[in-house]
Design a protein with these regions (language model features):
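Short, charged surface segments at domain edges that flank catalytic/cofactor-binding sites
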Residues: 1-30, 107-112
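Conserved aromatic-histidine-acidic binding/catalytic patches
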Residues: 6, 57, 75
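Histidine-centered nuclease catalytic patch
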Residues: 30-64
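Short Cys/His-centered divalent metal-binding micro-motifs
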Residues: 36, 65-92
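Short microdomains enriched in Cys/His and/or Lys/Arg
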Residues: 51-65, 88-102
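Short flanking/linker segments adjacent to small metal-binding domains or redox-active Cys/His motifs
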Residues: 95-128
Length: 128
């Protein structure tokens, strides 16, 4: 598998993990920014990032990601202000600033690191 294929696989596994982690026993998950509820799988919910996936330091950071509906994640550009307020409420006052600072770090994940992350999140999914 190419590196691009490995990144795509990790994105897919990580996205499923985030959505299922916050789903209830019936598979219903709530959008982090608008509270809309939908089934975790399919078009209804996505893995929303506070700081864009372009930041390699935060692309697969669990604190940076929460389930978001398509409208908030894509049409409303992630609702970053509301996302930040919710992160600060959940983790403490400075969480959004901490993530913003971390996003400026230069990170290059090795291929073995990416493969390890795929294995880790596949294991997490099996245990859900």
């Amino acid at each position: 598998m190419t590196r691009k294929g490995i990144v795509k696989k990790l994105d897919t596994v990580f996205s499923e993990y985030i959505r299922r982690k916050y789903a209830d026993k019936n598979g219903i998950v709530k959008c982090y920014t608008c509270n809309k509820k939908a089934y975790w799988k399919g078009e209804g919910m996505q893995n929303g990032h506070f700081i864009s996936r372009a930041s390699r330091a935060l692309r697969w950071d669990e604190d940076n990601c929460r389930p978001q509906c398509y409208a908030c994640n894509c049409m409303r550009y992630g609702q970053n202000y509301i996302f930040a307020m919710n992160l600060n409420e959940e983790f403490g006052y400075n969480k959004a600033d901490e993530l913003l600072t971390k996003s400026r770090e230069i990170v290059k994940h090795s291929t073995p690191e990416l493969l390890d992350k795929i294995e880790y999140y596949n294991e997490q999914l099996k245990n859900m």
